[in-house]
């Protein structure tokens, strides 16, 4: 949307790896993000974003990004198939027993 305007643009950066960012546009796009320094040198972030879809509904997502990767949730995303969840659970059990994956 070329005519969209920024309604809100808030940014705070403490200079030490801690930050907060939030914006909203006139066409319904929203994004909020908070970050803190991570234990392995990365920046840990969590936030949410949303945008309007052509049918008038809104696509909404929440996420965490940290030393364990990027994890996003949304009603629009499919569920993990049962066989995949079983593999994830099995790997977690093995890690708990001390198995190391290279």
From Swiss-Prot:
GO terms, molecular function: structural constituent of cuticle
The residue ranges of the Chitin-binding type R&R domain are 16-81
The organism named in the record is Cancer pagurus
- UniProt tissue specificity: Arthrodial membrane and calcified shell.
Alphabetized, the UniProt keywords read: Cuticle
Pfam families hit by this protein: Chitin_bind_4 (PF00379)
Quote the InterPro entries the UniProt record gives.
CHIT_BIND_RR_consensus (IPR031311), Insect_cuticle (IPR000618)
Instruction: Keyword check for DNA-binding, yes or no.
Output: no
Protein name in the entry: Cuticle protein AM/CP1114
Note down the stretches annotated as region Disordered. Answer: 23-50
